Amino acid sequence: MWLEILNNVRSRKKAIKFPKTFQKSPDEVIETVTPVKKMNKVFGKSLRIRQVDAGSCNACEWECNMLTNPIYDVQRFGVDFVPSPRHADVILATGPVSRQMELALKKTYIAMPEPKLVISCGDCALDGGIYKGSYATRDGVSNVLPVNCHIPGCPPPPKTIVKEL
């Protein structure tokens, strides 16, 4: 990479070439869906997300973290991840909900202002995934909170997460 930067400086190129492994540019990767007018009135064309890891293997968190990189850049759509549930519109919950995280997830939901949305991300959050039936889990977010939307996949790719948001 350093050699490529040095060559760009010598040839006075303005930017590093986009990787050849990608078939499309970042703007073509994300197909935006026209938002519903009612949702625009409620959320003001922006969405604040509180991500909660409820006992997952962290694969879904990695994919959610990729949403903020330059390729997907969800902030250009008005989507922000917030550290406090008091500023959040949506809980993005991942994992099968371990017994230790059940109370924390409920407290996060209670701390959110109205209107509240819950999105379960990944197959573990839907029905427990590979942890289904374990004594240590609640077999999905829907057994703890009312879920409004589910993002399928193990883990779901960032493009799918962006489409659902």
Whereabouts are the PLM-identified features?
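Structural motif
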Residues: 89-90, 117
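Metallocofactor- and cofactor-centric catalytic cores in central/energy metabolism, strongly enriched
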Residues: 81, 93, 98-102
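Glycine-rich, charge-decorated loop segments at or immediately adjacent to ligand/cofactor-binding or catalytic sites
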Residues: 126-142
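Short acidic low-complexity segments
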Residues: 78-87
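A short, gly/pro- and small-residue-rich
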Residues: 104-119
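Iron-sulfur (Fe-S) cluster-binding modules
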Residues: 1-59, 66, 70-74, 82, ...
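Short glycine-rich anion-binding loops that position phosphate/pyrophosphate groups of nucleotides
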Residues: 55, 96-98, 124, 156
